[in-house]
UniProtKB/Swiss-Prot annotation:
Top-level lineage group: Bacteria
Gene Ontology cellular component annotations, sorted alphabetically: cytoplasm
Catalytic reactions on record: Fe-coproporphyrin III + 2 H(+) = coproporphyrin III + Fe(2+)
InterPro entries: Ferrochelatase (IPR001015), Ferrochelatase_AS (IPR019772), Ferrochelatase_C (IPR033644), Ferrochelatase_N (IPR033659)
Name of this chain's protein: Coproporphyrin III ferrochelatase 1
Record keyword GTP-binding present: no
Assigned EC number: 4.99.1.9
Localization of this protein: Cytoplasm
Native organism: Bacillus cereus (strain ZK / E33L)
CDD domains tied to this protein: Ferrochelatase_C (cd00419), Ferrochelatase_N (cd03411)
GO terms for MF: ferrochelatase activity; metal ion binding
Keywords: Cytoplasm, Heme biosynthesis, Iron, Lyase, Metal-binding, Porphyrin biosynthesis
Amino acid sequence: MKKKIGLLVMAYGTPYKEEDIERYYTHIRRGRKPSPEMLEDLTERYRAIGGISPLATITLEQAKKLEKRLNEVQDEVEYHMYLGLKHIEPFIEDAVKEMHNDGIQDAIALVLAPHYSTFSVKSYVGRAQEEAEKLGNLTIHGIDSWYKEPKFIQYWVDAVKGIYNGMSDAEREKAVLIVSAHSLPEKIIAMGDPYPDQLNETADYIARGAEVANYAVGWQSAGNTPDPWIGPDVQDLTRELNEKYGYTSFVYAPVGFVAEHLEVLYDNDFECKVVTDEIGAKYYRPEMPNASDAFIDSLTDVVVKKKESVM
């Protein structure tokens, strides 16, 4: 009989329906309810992208496809997938409890975010391991980052190339690629967090692979707090690159995210497009990885490598 291994897939989570927005936002704010204005602002953003984010559906599809693929590519162990979310049910702790109840003793934990940071990956894996320690007899092996995974980089190289191949030579010369991820509070840099460096590296790999000479790194979706967040913000960067270099086509690759969701569909497709429209430039954004075969293959390699290194 094959050994059963837990596959703990973790993600941020998103409201399932409009009525969930307040409790979701309250959880993000560590139990403090948002003001009516803040709640209205977030609700309006969801309405602007069609009422609710497709993220919940995509995350589940990614996790299920990954489990299926892992069980197809090898025959030594049987992977059982558990989904754990940071800010809405099924919570990370609930997924760990379920694993424990199912008699799983070893699990690989994968966060659906390619870059490591103390704010994201470390906190997800930390929550899972803490719960596993409480329950006993369950070891969770966390994956720190997978931004260098060749098939992940290749996904974005192909996606970016696809956009540039549709341009004329003249347009290509005046085009710039903006590679971005979710901003985090600036204080993480002083703490030696590798997050910004990993995004810069990702941008270099993608630009090199796609043979794009003009590119820049930007940050997006910063939180509404008094602390300074990492910049430049993608909207400011767009204006600056247009003013400084006269770029007239902007290609946005939000590589810190893995799916179409609010931060991409609103912060990129709406807010960045407002800026490109304002300056008379063209807006492009490649399709997100979502549950594409190429992306699932890259995650499969990540999990298999981790399993081989720890078991």
